């Protein structure tokens, strides 16, 4: 059991991250877990260097952890993540309702996170992903037969691996469309999700040689994806493409977003119909 354990299955949760933060009234928010723990196995700092103790650093209240008065668990103060809005267009999309402040994207927010590992008896009653591999018969057949398998990731900064603590990705510059290296190395040293998926596929299909290509670009929108799919993705000779756009297109109407995703798929399949 580890980082790829399915959170919607079983009764074990590994290192669920939570963050305590200060709200506008000075109250401490956070501490909510996905499930109500039966047994908490560990509560640690983001780098596992500090082990927090129940009763000393926190208490349990149903599915929440509550900080004690003298807890060692860090609190993200409001002045760190909430800044005065000065009219800079790049921050307008995260402006708060009062119009005077905006939410800062704190690149090292992980320093305020704690990791909770626990067991539970709760049944997952929300959305559960299902196996849809039957919709990709050519890709699945290729994986099962073995040989070189070209896996391409195409999306925004999350797919590129930005802020993953163990990121080591070759991604794309959104403006120049040139390759560049994204590297981060700090605890807990977790690879970008594209690397995790690639490694998992390689483990599951050892007869195949998974060749990963990351064509994602930080800051890119789904419309950028439409404009550059032919140049960036098609030359990779993909057997499977995983799209990861959306974070920078949150203001797009659903219809336009869906049409853009379909356009990317059509562009790729026009040259690679078996993908």
Residue ranges and their predicted role:
Residues 1-154, 159-186, 203-208, 236, ...:
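N-terminal secretory targeting modules
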Residues 214-216:
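Residue-level recognition of beta-strand->loop/alpha-helix junctions
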Residues 144-145, 170, 191-211, 220, ...:
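Alpha-helical cap/lid subdomain in secreted, periplasmic
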């Amino acid at each position: 059991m580890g980082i790829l354990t399915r959170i919607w299955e079983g009764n074990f949760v590994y290192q669920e991250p939570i963050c305590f933060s200060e709200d506008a009234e000075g109250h401490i928010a956070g501490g909510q877990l996905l499930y109500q723990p039966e047994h908490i196995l560990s509560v640690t700092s983001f780098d596992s260097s500090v082990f927090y103790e129940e009763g000393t650093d926190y208490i349990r209240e149903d599915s929440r952890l509550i900080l004690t008065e003298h807890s060692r668990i860090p609190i993200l103060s409001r002045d760190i993540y909430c800044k005065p809005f000065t009219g800079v267009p790049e921050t307008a999309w995260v402006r708060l309702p009062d119009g005077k402040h905006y939410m800062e994207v704190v690149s090292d927010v992980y320093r305020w996170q704690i990791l909770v590992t626990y067991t539970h008896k709760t049944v997952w009653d929300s959305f559960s992903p299902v196996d849809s591999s039957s919709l990709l018969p050519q890709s699945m057949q290729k994986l099962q037969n073995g040989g070189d398998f070209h896996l391409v990731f195409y999306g925004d900064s999350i797919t590129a691996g930005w802020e993953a603590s163990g990121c080591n990705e070759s991604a794309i510059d959104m403006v120049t469309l040139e390759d560049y290296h994204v590297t981060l190395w700090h605890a807990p040293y977790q690879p970008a999700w594209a690397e995790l998926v690639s490694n998992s596929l390689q483990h599951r299909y050892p007869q195949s040689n998974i060749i990963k290509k990351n064509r994602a670009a930080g800051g890119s929108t789904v419309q950028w994806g439409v404009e550059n799919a032919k140049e960036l993705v098609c030359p990779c000779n993909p057997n499977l493409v995983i799209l990861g756009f959306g974070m920078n297109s949150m203001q797009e109407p659903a219809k336009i977003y869906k049409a853009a995703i379909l356009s990317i798929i059509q562009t790729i399949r026009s040259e690679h119909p078996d993908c």
